[in-house]
From Swiss-Prot:
Domain called KH: residue spans: 562-621
Protein name (record): Polyribonucleotide nucleotidyltransferase
UniProt record, GO biological process: mRNA catabolic process; RNA processing
Cellular localisation: Cytoplasm
Amino acid sequence: MSEVIKSISVDGREIKLTIGRFAPQAGGCVLIESGETSVLVTATRSSGREGIDFLPLLVDYEERLYAAGRVPGGFLRREGRPPEKATLTCRLIDRPMRPLFPNWLRDDLQIVATTISMDEQVPPDVLAVTGASVATLLAKIPFKGPMAAVRVGLVGDDFIINPTYEEISEGELDLVVAGSPDGVIMVEAGANEVAEQDMIEAIDFGYEVVCDLIKAQKELIAELGIEQVEEAAPETDPTLENFVQERVTDPVKDVLARFEKDKNVRDAALDEIKESVKVAIDELPETDPVQVAAVENPKAIGKVFKSITKTLMRRQVVEDKVRVDGRKLDEVRPISCNVGVLPQRVHGSGLFNRGLTQVLSIATLGTPGDAQEMDDLHPDSQKRYLHHYNFPPYSVGETRPMRSPGRREVGHGALAERALLPMLPSKEEFPYVLRVVSEVLSSNGSTSMGSVCGSTLSLMDAGVPLAKPVSGAAMGLIKEGEEVRVLTDIQGIEDFLGDMDFKVAGTADGITALQMDMKITGLSMKVIAEAIHQAKPARLHILDKMLATIDSPRETMSPYAPRLLTIKIDPEQIGMIIGPGGKTIKGITEETGAKIDIEDDGRVTISAVDEKAASRARQIIAGMTRKLAAGDVFLGKVTRIIPIGAFVEIAPSKEGMIHISQLADYRVGKVEDEVTVGDEVVVKIRELDNRGRINLTRLGIHPEEAAAARAGGSES
């Protein structure tokens, strides 16, 4: 293919597509650029796999540090495991792409997006999403696109398309909208208590620009003479399909009509029906067409059974407006909350139950040195709030190897983290690093929103002064023709057989996080608005249940949580605190048992489980960095004695001398008669001479000054 370049204007900024220059052996390749950010995206298809019942789509997103002119750290000086941001971008690409592939497709598909140049203005993620659509169209893969994505920011009262990093940090909203010709297909947002109506308008605003990008892709494909591929779906043998349908339709209908609230009982009943039809087929003669079809396609029975169950469940919701567990469309499952469920060795804990979904969240208060350093291309180099989500196999009654967190766990953890972020206290107000781990102990839908609720409970139990508590609910959708039903607080089967998973988190006053995924090719703004508005009473209902358990953060922290004290010093004094080779700071740590973190701006944070240890370390640092003046009083230690006096350390690396005549208000014959090495003595600065020497005295010190010095401070 010869080289083709197409430019698209998006809200006054240019997006450039370059085709035919790179990766000639990939199925499709595009270089998508905006500003100095460039992302190379490829899509490739290989032959199908036997015996699988899912779409084997693999999405990889790579960030090369050369893109920002940097050399990787570490011994190997090479990029290693993808950072969390890369994993989240993989999901951002995958989620709007997957519904647009035919659900019968079993060929291996791989989309690889590589950021090869990046400035500090344009985020590469939405470029990668749009680039994935272009590359797939070029690869002539069956695909119901085009698809495109944009980011929407809110600064003041104005929506901004594809805001810069600076505009994102200054704004109240960071929203990504992806869509197809059929409607919105994916939404991802973090927000600072944005009102429901404002969020709806932002999504609509973004989708209008998405439509422009879709139009540009169609024009490009037409110019290149590429026609979108349509392939016939493989058909299930009609004889087998009819056999299964006749035997399972009524029994499945009966199970669904019981409105069984216990998922396990319902699943067992459905499994029994499926097994009975398998037994019936096995008993047929080997030459029977149904038996032959089942042997040729072993997964066909399960496929047909799922299709029948899906149709009946959806019909029940659409026609009768009743769900499989008997709930109304807008009804939330029973909720219970507990805090302080673990011993105080953990700093805070919260247990959140919603139906059969159970999440245990544990909060840990760390020191500033526990902040996570982010070695990636993005401007934020540190994280002081971490949320980790774990989904063990026993939570769904299964067995499987337990390895490192998968993309789903990383994504769910990041969503719950994002929901709480705007409500966390500032670093100045509460200098702790915060980590919450959410353990999913039982899953029947909406575990990510359960993690939001559990995180709030555990942080409040730990004494973290949240601005406001946050709760969340997951909304679902059943769409049959023109009939649409929005479901509140979906459970597993409704997620599995439904069309949408729409998670909304926020406070009583607005939305803080949003995530929408579709299984259909797009959704109208009318339905999205209905889902967002319907989520609010559910969130508030859940919030009321949480506040009935704990209505404000605890006033006292766990006795095992570190106590933090801060002191501000002149940045030029940092070297003095650290000392040669770290000798001074190590000495303070060894003497007091406190941990000391120093920032470039001179903020010193001292932490220790024992508050007295932290106070002692702060006293030492304050003494070292204090500008000395005549009349200041200190508690010092005698370090050496000479015939004419004694040297006293009043702070690390700061010594003064008491002349023998200043040891007492009477004549002293020998210095040793008054003090010995190691004695702690209260002294006052008598004079600072022009050579920087400190002359001390024990005379003329008021009792109040002496008491203050011994108590840990110094008076002037």
